Amino acid sequence: MAIKYAMTYQSTRGEDEGAGYSDIVLKGLAADGGLFMPRIYPQVTKTDLEDWRHLSYAELAFEILRLFATDIEEDTLKTMLAGVYREDVYNNGRTGEDFSKITPTRSIDGGKIRILELSNGPTLAFKDMAMQYLGALFEYILEKRNTELNILGATSGDTGSDRKSTRL
């Protein structure tokens, strides 16, 4: 599907900021304290969903994010996501699993229930799914704008500095 709009975001509290994707990533919250939400919601058709069924995780992330991150060139976004969602990063699953799936599913109860595994990333937490992308996204935006940003974060011990893979 061809993108024919420039996605902008506004505050949930009503202030009409009209900010782009990269702007809201750096701002975090709207000036009035609200969260950012898209001004319009992209339409995804049944055909789109069918076409996306067999994509890799990185490819599917690209198809969805390109609808919202219209200020990032598509080739750049695609490369970024392919670099983030890689088999060698998401390889902390069960022995014998296909790590290329990034988020494999497994069946229980005779196949009646399927569980999506979101804890195969570097810190073994579901948060890796978003945070790995967010790190790459910040690097891209800050480099493009030739600026720096200091982020102070706090975490609990289960995904923080007690993890061997965490770099401080």
Predicted features, each with a name:
Residues 1-167:
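PLP-dependent amino-acid enzyme catalytic core
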